[in-house]
UniProtKB/Swiss-Prot annotation:
The organism of origin for this protein: Azotobacter vinelandii (strain DJ / ATCC BAA-1303)
Residues at the catalytic site: 37 (proton donor)
Protein name (database record): Pantothenate synthetase
Pathway stated in the Swiss-Prot or TrEMBL entry: Cofactor biosynthesis; (R)-pantothenate biosynthesis; (R)-pantothenate from (R)-pantoate and beta-alanine: step 1/1
Cell location: Cytoplasm
Keywords, comma-separated and alphabetical: ATP-binding, Cytoplasm, Ligase, Nucleotide-binding, Pantothenate biosynthesis
Length: 283
């Protein structure tokens, strides 16, 4: 595996791989990698000949009160994990390389509707930052495919919409959330939890699972299910941000008759914001 830090170097390496007839996959990350990220790399190896991972802690997607400065930078450990996972090339630029004109005047990409509500309501500007950096990475790397985890479900929907609306010739794969044995979705932010909070955290997925079970049993009072779920989160020790049931593809509010749903939630344990979701298909 080689590590490159400039756009020029990456484009040259991609051109060589393309010249050899290789199919190229991109796995964008912010580093501090865990087993969920490496699962994406391993899936990419199955679907492509040349796997590019990127590590860039994107300042454009962090709000002023968020944890940009605290976000762990673990490049050496990440390189080892990527190598073991079968990555061919790591692109690890700094902010000056990605935003050479500075962020103040940076052209930004906005994906309306699907980015609104849910995490978009709690984190203004977040998905604009995500869409902008992903567009830049797609333009630089020109991958055939790109892989993202379903844990960040709204982000995945934003990226699918972006690619569709801008006619990008890139196939987007959403991969299932990787979980700890107790059900907690793997996340770089889990490291912020203390021992007591870590013991509480799996309740988030259990509560989503209970809602999914009720829906599959025929319950269609979605507002009532969400209200009970929010109360269950509070009783477990969370400070809920949201818990909603949406139509899976469009992310519009769910309605009776929808056959593919997703239950999405965000909640705080202390100062750590956890997100999770559960897809529910109704036969």
């Amino acid at each position: 595996m080689i590590t490159l830090k400039t756009v020029r170097e990456l484009r040259a390496a991609i051109a060589r791989a393309r010249g050899d007839g290789k199919r190229i996959a991109l796995v964008p990350t912010m580093g501090n990698l865990h087993a969920g990220h490496i699962a994406l790399v391993e899936k990419a190896r199955q679907r492509a000949d040349f796997v590019v991972a990127s590590i860039f802690v994107n300042p454009l997607q962090f709000g002023p009160a968020e944890d940009l400065d605290k976000y762990p930078r673990t490049l050496a450990a990440d390189q080892e994990k990527l190598l073991e996972g079968g990555c061919n090339l790591l692109f690890a630029p700094n902010a000056e390389e990605m935003y050479p004109g500075g962020m103040q005047g940076q052209t930004r990409i906005s994906v309306p509707v699907v980015s609104e509500g849910l995490c978009g309501a709690a984190r203004p500007g977040h998905f604009e930052g995500v869409a902008t950096v992903v567009t830049k990475l797609f333009n630089i790397a020109q991958p055939d495919i790109a892989l993202f985890g379903e844990k960040d479900y709204q982000q995945l929907a934003v990226i699918r919409t972006l690619v569709r609306d801008l006619n990008m010739p890139i196939q987007i794969f959403g991969e299932p959330t990787v979980r700890a044995a107790d059900g907690l979705a793997l996340s770089s932010r889990n490291g912020y939890l203390n021992d007591e909070q870590r013991n509480v955290a799996p309740a988030l997925y259990r509560i989503l699972s209970d809602i999914g079970t009720a829906i599959q049993a025929g319950e269609q009072d979605f507002a009532g299910l969400c209200a009970r779920g929010l109360e269950a989160l509070r009783q477990a020790g969370f400070r809920p941000d949201y818990l909603e049931i949406r139509e899976a593809a469009s992310l519009r509010p769910a309605a009776p008759g929808d056959l593919r749903l997703v239950v999405l939630a965000a909640a705080y344990l202390g100062n750590t914001r956890l997100i999770d979701n559960l897809s529910v298909d109704i036969a």
